[in-house]
Amino acid sequence: MNAKDLRIVFMGTPEFASTSLRRLVDEGYNIVAVVTTPDKPAGRGQKMHLSDVKLTALDLGLPLLQPEKLRDEEFLAALRALQPDLGIVIAFRMLPEVVWAMPRLGTF
């Protein structure tokens, strides 16, 4: 199997994770979903703040998952349905074992 055929789930939040996500897409890797933090109010006006990774995923037209809880059954079912080969994590939350172990080749 060619590395670019792998079904990759990308997990991250800040700007420097966005750079890596964009590079993977630019290089032709198959990102089947992006997992990032839920939108949250920030600042004086409590305007909704979207993570840099979410903004990048939207710009690239990638599917998004934004679970409140990483052990949520709905999220886990959605992740399983993607049948990921590989998970790439850059500056994201601590992953529960069930998420960490889901991709058949592992999560890095």
What are these regions (language model features)?
Residues 1-108:
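One-carbon transfer enzymes
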